[in-house]
Amino acid sequence: MEKFVIRGGKPLRGTVQISGAKNSAVAVLPAALLADSPSVIDNLPDIKDIETLAEIIKRLGGKVEKGKHEIKIDPTGLNSFHPPRELASRMRASYYLIGALLSKFNEAIIPMPGGCNIGVRPIDQHIKGFEALGAETTIEHGFIRIKAEKLRGAHIYFDVVSVGATINLMLAAVKAEGVTILENCAKEPHVVDVANFLNAMGANIKGAGTDTIKITGVDKLEGCHYTIIPDQIEAGTYMVAAAATGGDVYVKGVIPTHLESIIAKLVEMGVIVEEYDDVIRVRREGPLKRVDIKTLPYPGFPTDMQQPFAVLLALADGISVITENIYENRFRYLEELKKMGMKVRVEGRSAIIEGVGKLTGAPVYATDLRGGAAMVIAGLAAEGITEVLDIYHIDRGYEAMEVKLQALGADIIRIRE
């Protein structure tokens, strides 16, 4: 087991380079399995979820050559549609293998997805879509089995906006016979990124980033060289860390338009934000103001950023409210922040946070990936020493977090116990 030990109270200063988008990468790697030749994917984040996916692809018969930020995937030897449970159950995004393997073999057997324990996250919209394409679904003994004689295009309306279902149905429909129309689609940047990757391999996908996506099935895809977009959530995390510590940080290698909702809330709180081509400067010189936050599908405020912002709201003047509209039960991390002096109560989908001005160091657990990031930010801003335990959650989605923070002047070390 490993933990972070943080001595707080030091403003972050300097420049941080943002890695490739986790949420893109975990879908692009399964998408590469659809080609009849190798693909090279770069700007890959060096995180645990990518290591897990690479190992799964090897177990399925694919060849993988992985560097730190680049991977070559050769799917020509793929011979299995049944990823091993011990690997696939580690990460929720393993469900993208369903769409990819269903498209490749007309069959997929996947263990129920793992990842962060943040409440009910059903995959009913995925299953509804697969069945509309002609597949049959059974769930037994902890596995999802999906099988089709032939996949045929269909008109599919998602009952709720779902990033996972939108991407998974693109993967499944890309080689299906005829035309597939997806309506009420997610518009997140990584949805567009996956569509761009598939199109670079020869797919015919139009409308990604809008409510309606049209997919005209093609007979074959060929591998390509592709660069993943920067990680908007990692960028947002460092922007919040700069504000929480009263620092001055240049967040480099970003697409500012992907961060508009995050920037808007920081500015509303009194943080100074300057935008350049691929750099955002974040600095705080005065007190933080209270704000209310409602998580919404993109371009609304991202659910993955409410946890870091909760720390900022604890340091602000007045009472703020976070309303979580995407996932149920995504406030478990707040119990840990209470140990550091946070005043908060949860009422249904809302967390009411009373600003306390300062936090104090304490031993806390990273309850999940983004909750773990919130613990680190709290530790950086707090008086005294904070220990963040169970940091494997953080390593699943943040590349070398302590190394990047050390370069900004943070007093943070990783300890192996």
Swiss-Prot record:
UniProt keyword annotation of Cell division present: yes
- Say yes or no: keyword rRNA processing present: no
Please list the GO biological process terms of this entry. Answer: cell division; cell wall organization; peptidoglycan biosynthetic process; regulation of cell shape; UDP-N-acetylgalactosamine biosynthetic process
Specify the superkingdom. Bacteria
Q: Which residues carry this modification: 2-(S-cysteinyl)pyruvic acid O-phosphothioketal?
A: 116
Q: Which reaction does it catalyse?
A: phosphoenolpyruvate + UDP-N-acetyl-alpha-D-glucosamine = UDP-N-acetyl-3-O-(1-carboxyvinyl)-alpha-D-glucosamine + phosphate
User: Gene3D superfamilies, per this entry?
Assistant: Enolpyruvate transferase domain
**Recorded GO MF terms:** UDP-N-acetylglucosamine 1-carboxyvinyltransferase activity
The entry's active site is 116
Annotated pathway: Cell wall biogenesis; peptidoglycan biosynthesis
One of the record's GO cellular component terms: cytoplasm
What keywords does the record list, in alphabetical order? Cell cycle, Cell division, Cell shape, Cell wall biogenesis/degradation, Cytoplasm, Peptidoglycan synthesis, Pyruvate, Transferase
* Name of a matching Pfam family: EPSP_synthase
Query: What are the binding positions for UDP-N-acetyl-alpha-D-glucosamine in this chain?
Result: 92, 121-125, 304, 326
Q: What does this protein do?
A: Cell wall formation. Adds enolpyruvyl to UDP-N-acetylglucosamine.
Cited PANTHER family:
UDP-N-ACETYLGLUCOSAMINE 1-CARBOXYVINYLTRANSFERASE, UDP-N-ACETYLGLUCOSAMINE 1-CARBOXYVINYLTRANSFERASE 2
Q: What is this protein called?
A: UDP-N-acetylglucosamine 1-carboxyvinyltransferase 3
User: Which species is this UniProt entry from?
Assistant: Caldanaerobacter subterraneus subsp. tengcongensis (strain DSM 15242 / JCM 11007 / NBRC 100824 / MB4)
Q: Which gene encodes it?
A: murA3
